[in-house]
Amino acid sequence: MGQKINPLGFRLGTTQGHHSLWISQPKNYSKGLKEDQNIRDFIQNYIQKNMRISSRDRVEGIARIEIKKTIDLIQIIIFMGFPIENRPRKVKEKIKELQIHLEKEFHYVKKKLKIAITKIAKPYQNPKILAEFLAGQLKDRVSFRKAMKKAIELAEQADTEGIRVQMAGRINGKDIARVEWIRRGRLPLQTIRTKIDYCCYTIRTIYGVLGIKIWIFIDEK
């Protein structure tokens, strides 16, 4: 019987890279991973509460957060799909505030903390941003099929070669959970050298929890 594998882990080291870049002793490895996850959660919550994202779709817009650690420096790069605010001066102030709050939260006294924000060129090529868009549509009571088709249209406009959107759970409040999916274009999941991006996203609705999975194929010629 065939087994499903995570597309990102399957391509790690070929077309996918690590989001945490540091070296640690084996006994401290789990502690470092937990710290990274706490940093990511803290940044996402802070941006959601304190920063205004310039997106008409009310998407948070964080594609990924990379963390690089050395002996005396922690460098955090936030990849975003949409700009924060409209004034560069205001953005610098917000980043400085975030840095101060992070230093207080994680007690970084001996280590220097550096935060940078990088805007990605095509936001809707990123499955996490698409999943956030889809979640926002469902919260606005848009039909799930209409929302899925709109997400696929946005991905196609961003020059993707192929996409699959899958939704599972009590869709439209039905008593029995089911799986619905739509696929467009090519999606060669078994070829390691292909650039496949993937996201698994959870959304809480009035009917219960829905799971969203998105696969995107980007042909990098």
UniProtKB/Swiss-Prot annotation:
Please list the GO terms describing molecular function: rRNA binding; structural constituent of ribosome
How is this protein organized at the quaternary level? Part of the 30S ribosomal subunit.
Which SUPFAM superfamilies does the entry mention? Prokaryotic type KH domain (KH-domain type II), Ribosomal protein S3 C-terminal domain
Checking HAMAP family in the record gives: Ribosomal_uS3_B
Q: Which family does it belong to?
A: Belongs to the universal ribosomal protein uS3 family.
Q: Which InterPro entries match?
A: KH_dom-like_a/b (IPR015946), KH_sf_prok-type (IPR009019), Ribosomal_S3_C_sf (IPR036419), Ribosomal_uS3_bac-typ (IPR005704), Ribosomal_uS3_C (IPR001351), Ribosomal_uS3_CS (IPR018280)
Q: Where does the protein end up?
A: Plastid, Chloroplast
Q: Indicate yes or no for the key word Chloroplast.
A: yes
**Predominant place of localization:** plastid
Q: Which residue numbers delimit the KH type-2 domain?
A: 43-121
Superkingdom assignment: Eukaryota
Task: State one Pfam family annotation.
Answer: Ribosomal_S3_C
Which keywords does this Swiss-Prot/TrEMBL entry list?
Chloroplast, Plastid, Ribonucleoprotein, Ribosomal protein, RNA-binding, rRNA-binding
Report the protein name in the record: Small ribosomal subunit protein uS3c
What biological processes does GO assign it? translation
Q: Which organism is it from?
A: Jasminum nudiflorum
User: How is this protein annotated for GO cellular component?
Assistant: chloroplast; cytosolic small ribosomal subunit
